[in-house]
Amino acid sequence: LLGTSTPMPVADPLLTAARGNHHDAIDMANTWSHSSFGLMGGNEIPGMCMTMGGQRLLERSKDDVFFTDLNACNEFINGAELAQKITVATLVVFANQDKMTAAVNAMEVAETIPNCRTVRLQPCGHSMLSEQPNAVLDALKTIV
């Protein structure tokens, strides 16, 4: 599980903007999804900008896709109860500067799952696949 939380509430301004397919939703999510490291550049590839990559990815989404995703997160219930029923080895990867799903919430999810390990990424925000792709891959290799 990457950047998880239960419950997973979505801020009303973000949900409202996404419902109307307003670019403000992309701006908010993109800003909140990156650590201070990611917001200042931080990409190992010269000339690549993580925030612009995130923006362009969300801009390519069809209308209502982003809202549907955020709304599903916002309405997800019984996560802790369901997590206790997981019977396979599980890995929770979380980021120290995640503003979308706080690290403390990810650790709480991990504590409810039997046979669960955790990996904390730093410096990193919710967009861990763009900020720390190699660290995510290294973590995933330990579970597959």
Spans of features found by a protein language model:
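A conserved short beta-strand
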Residues: 1-7
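Short, conserved loop/helix-junction motifs that constitute active-site signature segments
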Residues: 83-87, 111-113
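Conserved alpha/beta-hydrolase "acid-adjacent" motif
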Residues: 99-105
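Short beta-strand/loop motif that positions the catalytic acidic residue
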Residues: 86, 92-94, 98
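Conserved alpha/beta-hydrolase catalytic His-Asp/Glu region
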Residues: 7-10, 16-85
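Active-site loop/turn elements of alpha/beta-hydrolase fold enzymes
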Residues: 4, 73, 123
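Active-site phosphate/pyrophosphate- and oxyanion-stabilizing loops and adjacent acidic/basic residues
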Residues: 107-108, 134
